[in-house]
Every structure is written in structure tokens, then in C-alpha cells.
A protein has these predicted regions:
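Short acidic-aromatic low-complexity motifs
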Residues: 17-21
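Vicinal oxygen chelate
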Residues: 1-14, 24-25, 31-121, 132-162
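C-terminal catalytic core of tyrosine-transesterase DNA break-rejoin enzymes
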Residues: 124
Length: 162
């Protein structure tokens, strides 16, 4: 019998998805996730709880279950949350996620805050920023760059037409 010896971090995201089994496979393919453990309803195959590690981060997820108040972004019509995932190379990470089925919303771009960032939507309605640092930028310099960007009419999002 195995025991639960995992040291939980102070905060872990808990994602609700439609078809958790497919989501688990997507996160493995897109982000190199490793599965810690899974609780499955033997009668339906539904995932009641699974824990994954993604690049050193602990993520939990479960199948949508409206009876428990768990609805996925697909059922809600979107999400107000975006996850920031630090990666070795944003270009490679975005390509890998796209190959696994993600939609690239913003291609890898050098950003004013000193990161190269890409924005993706996964097939389950969750949004992710894949990024790596390309330069050290002080808070003061970041504010100057932000002000200049806004003054120029730039939205800061290369995929935006606004």
C-alpha cells in the first residue's frame, strides 16, 4: 500500500475540464507533465481528481461535474484566469503545445518586461503564457517601457488588432 508523502505547495491550481483523461494526455504531450496519481470512477471512467507535475509546479484537475459545482471554461464560455508557465524556450514550448492541439493566441514575442512570451489556449478552455526571461528589467524601466508602449497605441499583444 502506498502512502501520501507528497509535500503540497502553499497554492496549486485546480482545473476543471471536459474529458479529464484527454486533458491529462494533452498536458503530458504539451508540457511534459508527469502524473502523480489519479482517482477514477470505475463505473463511468470519469476522473474525480488527478495530480500532475508540470515543470516543477503542482497542478490538480478533475472532470466537469455540475452536481458538485465544477464547470469547465468550455461550459462557462471562457475563463478569467491565465497560467504563467516558465519554460526553457518559449518558441519550442509553443510549438510543442501547438503540435499537441493548443491554439497559439500570441506567437512567441519579446516583451517589454524582459521575457519572451507566447500565449496559448488549450483544447479544454484554459489559457497559458509560456515564457522565458531574455533580460533583467527593473520595475522602473518596466514602467517606462509600459508607458511608451501605451503612448504609441500599442496594446502589448501582437495578436490583437485593437
Amino acid at each position: 500500500m502506498s502512502t501520501n508523502s507528497f509535500a503540497y505547495p502553499p497554492m496549486s491550481p485546480y482545473l476543471t475540464v471536459k474529458d479529464a483523461n484527454k486533458a491529462i494526455e494533452f498536458y503530458k504531450a504539451a508540457f511534459g507533465a508527469t502524473e502523480i496519481f489519479r482517482l477514477t470512477d470505475a463505473s463511468t471512467g470519469a476522473v474525480g481528481h488527478v495530480e500532475l507535475m508540470v515543470n516543477g509546479s503542482h497542478i490538480m484537475l478533475a472532470d466537469e461535474n455540475p452536481a458538485w459545482g465544477n464547470k469547465s471554461p468550455l461550459s462557462l464560455g471562457g475563463t478569467a484566469v491565465s497560467f504563467s508557465l516558465m519554460v526553457e524556450n518559449a518558441d519550442t514550448a509553443a510549438e510543442r503545445a501547438s503540435a499537441a492541439g493548443a491554439t497559439v493566441e500570441m506567437p512567441p514575442t519579446d516583451m517589454f518586461y524582459g521575457f519572451r512570451s507566447a500565449s496559448i489556449s488549450d483544447p479544454f478552455g484554459h489559457k497559458w503564457m509560456l515564457q522565458h526571461q531574455i533580460e533583467n528589467v527593473s520595475h522602473e524601466e518596466m514602467q517606462k517601457r509600459w508607458d511608451a508602449m501605451l503612448a504609441s497605441g500599442d496594446t502589448g499583444c501582437p495578436s490583437s488588432d485593437k
